[in-house]
Amino acid sequence: VKSANNSRFNELQQAESYEQWSSNYAIQIQCYMAALNLSRTLVVVYNKNDSGLYTEIIDIREGVLDKMKQKARQIILARTPPKSPYSSTDYRIKKFMSAKEQAVYNLEQLPDNVNCRNCKHSEPIIEGDGGWRCNKFNKPIDEAKQRAGCEQHIWLSSLVNLPIESQGDDSITYMKGPNSFTNAPKDQLGRTSYTSHEMKELSKVNYDPEVVKKLMRFRDEFGVNTRLEELTRK
């Protein structure tokens, strides 16, 4: 059973086909039928404006569920996010995302949370009950540790919207104009190397050289990863 406003309900009646009306709903109902071992099902759509009903019997299409499972597997294991089907000005982006969420979604800023799931060393486990694994320390990671992250964190390069100059097991070097920025763990920092927390703050100002100088002063005086909230404060 689905509900729809009058406009969408009229579109369904004109299409005369539930699966032609919505490709998302079509995939959904096919997966439901396959999972429940049904060969056909009755779908009912309720008009929220005038209580009208649309009914249709839908037959199963073999292979849809397996195809969607394979697609889900590819997405889960991907090292880069799928290409967005929406432009940065699409109403779904503007209406349903905060300014911060839009900036992260459009790769203009790094996410606020530095954690295992956005670290290059981690990967999902899809066997058994699932989970996450750290390849740096060669062990599974429970949820609490995933959320906390660690000082060996290196951003997934797909989240850093800069050209890659070079990368190693424990660092990635990016270019911003003539300047290089190496994302490295806390114990491997140099004058052009930055922790993931520092990279996050620098991304808010598009890696402004003046803010980089300020960061270096803070680091020299107070230590790594201290007073970062002051870097971009206006």
Language-model segments: what does each one mean?
Residues V1-Q14:
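Active-site ExK catalytic segment of metal-dependent nucleases
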